């Protein structure tokens, strides 16, 4: 408890990951995903279970995101995510987001 989490949930029987993404983001945030693509897979072993996370990039959606299940909602810049408390399984996602958002050493000067 008391940790921040990225929106998402479980894939239901007979449901594709893409359909689950759209359903979960509608249920949790009230948005209708228009375009999204798979981005990364995370496997994390806790002491009592192993979780597998399919992480997607949502490029466009309709609606205004709001916490529809009683949860708080915050838009956070990737560089600031390290200051927030997340479950251990989300660390790989935060590291990847931070790396993608960081300026490249090869950027034009």
Residue ranges and their predicted role:
Residues 1-28, 40:
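Conserved Nudix-box catalytic region and its N-terminal flanking loop in Nudix hydrolases
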Residues 55-57, 65-97:
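NUDIX/MutT-family hydrolases
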Residues 18, 49, 87-90:
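A structural signal for well-ordered alpha-helical scaffolds and beta->alpha junctions
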Residues 32-33, 41-65, 72-74:
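Active-site-adjacent beta-strand/loop module that shapes the phosphate/pyrophosphate-binding cleft
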Residues 98-109:
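Generic C-terminal helix-cap and adjacent flexible tail
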Residues 11-12, 44-45, 80-82:
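Short histidine/acidic/glycine/proline-rich micro-motifs that form metal-
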């Amino acid at each position: 408890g008391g940790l921040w989490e990225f929106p998402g949930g479980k894939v239901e029987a007979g449901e594709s990951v893409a359909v689950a993404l759209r359903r979960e983001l509608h249920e949790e945030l009230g948005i209708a995903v228009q375009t999204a693509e798979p981005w990364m897979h995370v496997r994390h072993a806790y002491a009592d279970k192993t979780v597998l996370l399919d992480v997607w990039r949502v490029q466009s959606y309709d609606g205004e995101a709001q916490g529809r299940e009683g949860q708080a909602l915050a838009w956070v810049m990737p560089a600031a995510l390290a200051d927030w408390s997340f479950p251990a399984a989300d660390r790989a996602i935060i590291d990847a987001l931070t790396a993608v958002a960081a300026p490249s050493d090869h950027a034009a000067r």
